Amino acid sequence: MATHFARGILNTREPLSTRLSAACHQSARLLPEYRQARFRASRSLLAELLFMLYGISELPEIINEANGRPVFSDRQLPRFSIAYTGNIVGVALKGRLRQG
């Protein structure tokens, strides 16, 4: 099972990924202002990683499990993890695209 990792530096001057859905932007607007940039940056990094690895052109819908962990609503997609430290965000994808 493959694990893919990407990291980036949080920078509000850098443009966001064009692969974020309108729903993702709406979810960010519901957060406190200080968390919005971090949320969008992590989702942008995740969207670009999905595009590079699987050719998925828009970030799929993300839901929260009962324990609060974010997952893709489509269970055929790999699991992911997002971590922050200071001004750095890291995204890991575990597994591969499952064929239904």
Language-model-detected regions and their locations in the chain:
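Core catalytic alpha/beta fold that binds nucleotide/phospho-ligands
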Residues: 1-99
